[in-house]
Amino acid sequence: MSRALRRALLVSLAFIVVAVAGRARAATADGPLGKVRRTNDRIMGLLRKQARSPAGAKPIDRELTRVVAQFLDFPELARLALGRHWEARSATERQEFSELLRQLIERSYLKQLRSNLNYTVRYLGEKIVGDQAEISTSIEVKRKGRSEALVIQYKMRRGTGGWMVYDVITDDVSVVRNYRSQFNRIIQRQSYNALLEKLRRKLKDPA
C-alpha cells in the first residue's frame, strides 16, 4: 500500500479516537455529527477499558471491529474503489472483493487504534444535502514530539443503517481515489484475479 494511502487511512479514524476540541454547528442525535460523537464515545470507552485490562484485548478488538463496521460503509467504499470494474463483476465476486477490502481496512484501523497516537481535532463545519453529508475538520497530529496539521473531510451518506462514512479526504487526497487508482492499475497491467491475490497476500502479512 502506498505511503499516501497509509497516511490517509491513518488519519481517517483520527476524529473517533481523540478528545474533540472547538465548536461546530449544532447537530441532531441522528445526524452525521451525532453519529461521529456517539462512535467517538464508544471507541474511547473501549480503549480505556483495554488499557486497564490488557488481558481482555481480544474481546475488545472484536467489539471495536463491530463498532467500526457500523460506522464505515464498506459496500459503498468497495464499489467506489473498484470503479468501472465493479459492473463486470458477478454478485459473488463483488461480495468476495468487498470482504477482502473490509478485512484490510478494519485491520489497518485497529492497528492505528492501538498505536496511542495523540490528536487534537476541531470541527470546521457540516454540510448536508439530502442523503449526503460532508464534515470538515482540522486535525493536529502529535507523535514523538512532532506536530502536523491536516485538513480532513468525511464523506457520509444516509442509508438503512443511518449515516455512514464512505470516503475520507486528507489534504485533498481521497482514500477512495487512491484505492481506485491502485486497483485500476493492477487490473489493467495484470488482471482482476491478480488484484485479489495481492489483497489476500496483504492480509497474510503481519499486522
Could you tell me what each predicted segment is?
Residues 149-177:
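Short beta-strand edge/turn micro-motifs at domain boundaries
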Residues 167-207:
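Low-complexity, intrinsically disordered terminal/linker segments enriched in charged
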Residues 29-109:
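Early exported N-terminus immediately downstream of N-terminal targeting peptides
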Residues 11-19:
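Bacterial N-terminal signal peptides
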Residues 20-28:
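Sec/Tat signal peptide C-region and signal peptidase I cleavage site
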Residues 101, 125-127, 139-141, 154-156, ...:
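A mature extracytoplasmic/lumenal domain signature
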Residues 107-148, 199-207:
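Surface-exposed, charged secondary-structure patches
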Residues 5-10:
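N-terminal export leaders
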